[in-house]
Amino acid sequence: AGNGYNFYEAYLWVKQADKGLMDRPVNYERAQWEWNSDMYVPQYPSASWLESIGRLGSDRPVVPSEYAHAMGNSTGGLWDQWKAIYQYPNLQGGYIWDWVDQGILVKDENGREYWAYGGDFGTNMPSDGNFCCNGIVNPDRNPHPAMSEVKYAHQNVAFEATDLANGKFNVLNRFYFTNLKKYMISYEVKENDKVVRRGKVSLDVAPQEKK
Protein backbone atom coordinates (compact mmCIF):
# COMPACT_ATOMS: atom_id res chain seq x y z
CA ALA A 1 0.00 0.00 0.00
CA GLY A 2 2.99 2.32 0.19
CA ASN A 3 3.19 5.00 2.88
CA GLY A 4 1.37 8.30 3.37
CA TYR A 5 -0.90 10.49 5.48
CA ASN A 6 -3.32 7.76 6.59
CA PHE A 7 -0.45 5.60 7.79
CA TYR A 8 1.10 8.51 9.67
CA GLU A 9 -2.22 9.13 11.42
CA ALA A 10 -2.69 5.42 12.13
CA TYR A 11 0.76 5.27 13.73
CA LEU A 12 -0.01 8.24 15.96
CA TRP A 13 -3.40 6.79 16.95
CA VAL A 14 -1.91 3.39 17.86
CA LYS A 15 0.77 5.05 19.97
CA GLN A 16 -1.83 7.11 21.84
CA ALA A 17 -4.28 4.22 22.29
CA ASP A 18 -1.55 1.89 23.55
CA LYS A 19 0.08 4.46 25.82
CA GLY A 20 0.38 3.23 29.37
CA LEU A 21 -0.82 -0.26 28.45
CA MET A 22 2.03 -1.99 26.67
CA ASP A 23 3.71 0.80 24.69
CA ARG A 24 4.34 -1.70 21.93
CA PRO A 25 6.62 -0.92 19.00
CA VAL A 26 4.97 -0.53 15.60
CA ASN A 27 6.42 -1.82 12.38
CA TYR A 28 5.20 -1.11 8.88
CA GLU A 29 7.29 -2.45 6.05
CA ARG A 30 6.40 0.19 3.45
CA ALA A 31 7.33 3.03 5.77
CA GLN A 32 10.93 1.96 5.20
CA TRP A 33 13.14 4.54 6.99
CA GLU A 34 10.32 7.04 7.63
CA TRP A 35 9.37 7.92 11.20
CA ASN A 36 6.14 5.91 11.42
CA SER A 37 7.85 2.57 11.91
CA ASP A 38 9.82 1.76 15.06
CA MET A 39 11.98 -0.72 13.21
CA TYR A 40 13.21 -1.12 9.66
CA VAL A 41 11.56 -4.17 8.11
CA PRO A 42 12.83 -4.75 4.55
CA GLN A 43 11.97 -7.75 2.40
CA TYR A 44 14.66 -10.22 1.35
CA PRO A 45 17.87 -8.32 2.06
CA SER A 46 21.03 -10.14 1.06
CA ALA A 47 23.55 -11.37 3.60
CA SER A 48 26.01 -8.74 2.37
CA TRP A 49 23.41 -5.98 2.89
CA LEU A 50 22.77 -7.18 6.45
CA GLU A 51 26.51 -7.19 7.08
CA SER A 52 26.77 -3.64 5.72
CA ILE A 53 23.86 -2.15 7.71
CA GLY A 54 25.06 -3.98 10.81
CA ARG A 55 28.53 -2.51 10.46
CA LEU A 56 27.26 1.01 9.69
CA GLY A 57 24.63 0.96 12.44
CA SER A 58 21.05 2.23 12.33
CA ASP A 59 18.75 4.46 14.36
CA ARG A 60 16.33 1.59 15.02
CA PRO A 61 16.31 -2.23 15.01
CA VAL A 62 16.49 -3.97 11.64
CA VAL A 63 14.09 -6.94 11.44
CA PRO A 64 13.37 -8.09 7.87
CA SER A 65 9.66 -8.77 7.42
CA GLU A 66 10.70 -11.60 5.11
CA TYR A 67 14.28 -12.71 4.67
CA ALA A 68 14.09 -16.38 3.67
CA HIS A 69 11.59 -18.01 1.33
CA ALA A 70 11.06 -21.64 2.38
CA MET A 71 9.54 -22.92 -0.87
CA GLY A 72 11.06 -26.01 -2.45
CA ASN A 73 14.83 -26.53 -2.12
CA SER A 74 15.50 -23.40 -0.10
CA THR A 75 16.92 -21.63 2.97
CA GLY A 76 20.45 -22.52 1.91
CA GLY A 77 21.57 -18.93 2.53
CA LEU A 78 20.06 -18.72 6.00
CA TRP A 79 23.30 -19.20 7.92
CA ASP A 80 25.10 -16.48 5.94
CA GLN A 81 22.39 -14.07 7.06
CA TRP A 82 22.49 -15.23 10.67
CA LYS A 83 26.25 -14.80 10.91
CA ALA A 84 25.63 -11.08 10.41
CA ILE A 85 22.58 -11.03 12.71
CA TYR A 86 24.54 -12.62 15.55
CA GLN A 87 27.45 -10.22 15.06
CA TYR A 88 25.63 -6.88 15.14
CA PRO A 89 23.13 -5.90 17.89
CA ASN A 90 21.01 -3.67 15.63
CA LEU A 91 20.12 -6.75 13.56
CA GLN A 92 17.43 -8.54 15.54
CA GLY A 93 16.25 -11.51 13.52
CA GLY A 94 13.66 -11.78 10.79
CA TYR A 95 10.59 -13.62 9.54
CA ILE A 96 10.70 -16.73 7.36
CA TRP A 97 8.07 -17.07 4.65
CA ASP A 98 6.61 -19.25 5.92
CA TRP A 99 5.92 -21.83 8.61
CA VAL A 100 3.67 -24.48 7.05
CA ASP A 101 2.61 -25.81 3.65
CA GLN A 102 -1.04 -24.97 3.05
CA GLY A 103 -2.26 -28.21 1.50
CA ILE A 104 -5.46 -30.15 2.15
CA LEU A 105 -5.41 -33.91 2.79
CA VAL A 106 -7.38 -35.76 0.07
CA LYS A 107 -7.40 -39.22 -1.50
CA ASP A 108 -6.91 -40.17 -5.13
CA GLU A 109 -9.02 -42.73 -7.01
CA ASN A 110 -6.94 -45.54 -5.49
CA GLY A 111 -7.41 -44.33 -1.94
CA ARG A 112 -3.89 -42.96 -1.55
CA GLU A 113 -3.60 -39.80 0.49
CA TYR A 114 -1.81 -36.69 -0.72
CA TRP A 115 -1.69 -32.97 -0.02
CA ALA A 116 -3.83 -31.15 -2.55
CA TYR A 117 -3.26 -27.59 -3.72
CA GLY A 118 -3.81 -25.31 -6.70
CA GLY A 119 -4.95 -27.14 -9.81
CA ASP A 120 -5.91 -30.24 -7.82
CA PHE A 121 -9.30 -28.60 -7.27
CA GLY A 122 -10.12 -28.12 -10.95
CA THR A 123 -8.69 -26.36 -13.97
CA ASN A 124 -11.26 -23.56 -13.86
CA MET A 125 -10.77 -22.79 -10.17
CA PRO A 126 -8.69 -19.83 -8.93
CA SER A 127 -5.17 -21.10 -8.31
CA ASP A 128 -1.72 -19.90 -7.34
CA GLY A 129 -0.25 -23.27 -8.32
CA ASN A 130 2.02 -24.65 -5.63
CA PHE A 131 2.80 -21.20 -4.23
CA CYS A 132 0.86 -22.07 -1.08
CA CYS A 133 3.33 -24.88 -0.32
CA ASN A 134 6.23 -22.81 0.93
CA GLY A 135 6.69 -23.79 4.57
CA ILE A 136 9.44 -25.50 6.53
CA VAL A 137 6.95 -28.19 7.59
CA ASN A 138 4.27 -30.19 5.77
CA PRO A 139 0.59 -29.52 6.48
CA ASP A 140 0.77 -32.31 9.11
CA ARG A 141 3.80 -30.54 10.65
CA ASN A 142 6.36 -33.14 9.57
CA PRO A 143 9.54 -31.16 8.91
CA HIS A 144 11.09 -30.48 5.52
CA PRO A 145 14.90 -30.72 5.19
CA ALA A 146 14.94 -26.91 5.49
CA MET A 147 13.90 -27.29 9.13
CA SER A 148 17.37 -28.65 9.95
CA GLU A 149 18.98 -25.49 8.58
CA VAL A 150 16.57 -23.30 10.55
CA LYS A 151 17.19 -25.30 13.73
CA TYR A 152 20.95 -24.92 13.34
CA ALA A 153 20.75 -21.17 12.72
CA HIS A 154 18.42 -20.59 15.68
CA GLN A 155 20.10 -22.85 18.25
CA ASN A 156 20.77 -21.19 21.59
CA VAL A 157 24.17 -22.81 22.18
CA ALA A 158 27.01 -22.62 19.66
CA PHE A 159 30.35 -24.42 19.55
CA GLU A 160 33.54 -23.21 17.88
CA ALA A 161 36.66 -25.34 17.56
CA THR A 162 39.78 -23.53 18.81
CA ASP A 163 42.22 -26.47 18.99
CA LEU A 164 40.74 -29.64 17.51
CA ALA A 165 43.88 -31.71 18.02
CA ASN A 166 43.57 -31.21 21.77
CA GLY A 167 39.78 -31.20 21.86
CA LYS A 168 39.35 -27.54 22.79
CA PHE A 169 36.22 -25.55 21.94
CA ASN A 170 34.60 -22.25 22.75
CA VAL A 171 31.01 -22.57 23.92
CA LEU A 172 28.75 -19.57 23.29
CA ASN A 173 25.56 -19.11 25.30
CA ARG A 174 23.08 -17.23 23.10
CA PHE A 175 20.35 -17.25 25.74
CA TYR A 176 19.55 -13.86 27.25
CA PHE A 177 18.38 -15.02 30.68
CA THR A 178 19.56 -18.62 31.15
CA ASN A 179 22.91 -19.91 32.39
CA LEU A 180 24.09 -23.08 30.65
CA LYS A 181 24.61 -24.77 34.03
CA LYS A 182 20.89 -25.53 33.84
CA TYR A 183 21.69 -28.01 31.05
CA MET A 184 23.67 -31.22 30.76
CA ILE A 185 25.50 -31.25 27.44
CA SER A 186 25.98 -34.63 25.75
CA TYR A 187 28.66 -35.04 23.09
CA GLU A 188 30.04 -37.66 20.72
CA VAL A 189 33.39 -37.86 18.92
CA LYS A 190 33.22 -39.76 15.64
CA GLU A 191 35.90 -41.22 13.39
CA ASN A 192 34.68 -42.27 9.93
CA ASP A 193 31.13 -42.10 11.27
CA LYS A 194 31.99 -44.46 14.15
CA VAL A 195 31.59 -43.16 17.70
CA VAL A 196 34.99 -43.40 19.43
CA ARG A 197 34.14 -41.32 22.47
CA ARG A 198 31.07 -39.97 24.19
CA GLY A 199 30.43 -38.10 27.40
CA LYS A 200 28.50 -35.46 29.29
CA VAL A 201 29.61 -32.12 30.63
CA SER A 202 28.03 -29.32 32.64
CA LEU A 203 29.21 -25.78 31.89
CA ASP A 204 28.79 -22.55 33.84
CA VAL A 205 28.40 -20.02 31.02
CA ALA A 206 26.41 -16.84 31.69
CA PRO A 207 23.86 -15.51 29.17
CA GLN A 208 25.46 -13.91 26.10
CA GLU A 209 28.93 -15.05 27.21
CA LYS A 210 31.32 -17.69 25.92
CA LYS A 211 33.89 -19.89 27.59
Task: List the model feature ranges, each with a label.
Residues G199-V201:
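Short hydrophobic alpha-helix segments
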Residues L203-K210:
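Short proline/glycine- and polar residue-rich coil/turn motifs
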Residues A1-N170, F175-K181, S186-V195:
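Extended substrate-binding grooves/exosites of carbohydrate-active enzymes
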